[in-house]
């Protein structure tokens, strides 16, 4: 390399290699929590359950993507297991404000990819949506009290991203 100048040989400049801990480019649906329907964690969980990443990866991404379980995937900040040490110390005073599962089971996205898995995920999603005040009427999800259809808008920075939202049609 070009790092063979006198200061290197005299050890006044140290060469050190750093591992790449780049999480790369993440693509995700970010829900606007200022919208009342997305303030309910059951609705957010149901939308995640209804998203069959494995099928989308196979049919649109040619199997090239890997689904990640942490916003900070590939870095030392990534969620990987149950909280411990300083992370647990930080979370402990918030225990009554975060889901109990944060302390009992590592976060994992739901798995689809097979008819049985997708069906089970959709059943659970519908159950959660029912608890949150929605029901199926015919083939449309509506608010139980008002009959208002469950609708939301997906915004993307590029028209080619529209196909990622097709599972929600």
Model-derived regions: residue spans:
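Extracytoplasmic/periplasmic ligand-capture domains
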Residues: 1-169
